[in-house]
Amino acid sequence: MKTFLILVLCLVMGSCVSFSKRMIKEDLMVVTKDNVNLIEGKYYSAGYEHIDSNRNKSEKVEGFSKMLSQKSIVGSEEIDKVEIKLKPLAKNKSYQLEFRLTKNDSLKYVFRHNAKLKKGLFLLGNYTSECHGIPYLLGGCQKFQSRMGLTKDNHLLVQDYYENSGGALFIMWAGYSINYGEKYKRIQ
């Protein structure tokens, strides 16, 4: 029984969100406390480059609203621009990012995420975890989180992590994890 509890504890603790920096490191501008305001600005909501976990680049993009939410209520055709405003919070390296989504300069949606500045990127507080059945016995869990930063050309970079894990009685293990990113051109 003690061994079983230790095994379950190891699985739960070991299944944290894990971003891969190698896919974005060649075009990443490191954001620090001194240049954190550079993230503020207007960007096109349609990405210009999609990067998968194997560092393959393509023009097939998800769109800004889909990248920040696993279950986006905002369709990519409903918006054409994103404005980001930054507000420092009391905690060290903690910020609130406000996203103003517009279509033809008409405001459509506003939402906010708290973020922590880690390793030159903003780790957003949009972490979601949904479990079905009895996780790792007869079910699984899905986890999602985003982080964002800037490219060397001052464009917006959003990176997502998605994990789907589970199994049947610890015998038949099933699951996968995906890292992917998209870049969005700065307007101003």
Question: PLM features: what roles do these ranges have?
Answer:
Residues 4-13:
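Sec-dependent N-terminal signal peptides
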Residues 87-132:
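Predominantly extracellular/secreted and cell-surface proteins with exposed
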Residues 108-111, 140-146:
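Short, surface-exposed coil-to-beta transition loops
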Residues 16-86, 90-92, 128-131, 142-147, ...:
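Amphipathic/hydrophobic helical signal segments and adjacent flexible N-terminal regions
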Residues 58, 111-114, 124, 137-138, ...:
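Surface-exposed beta-strand edges and their flanking turn/coil or helix-capping segments
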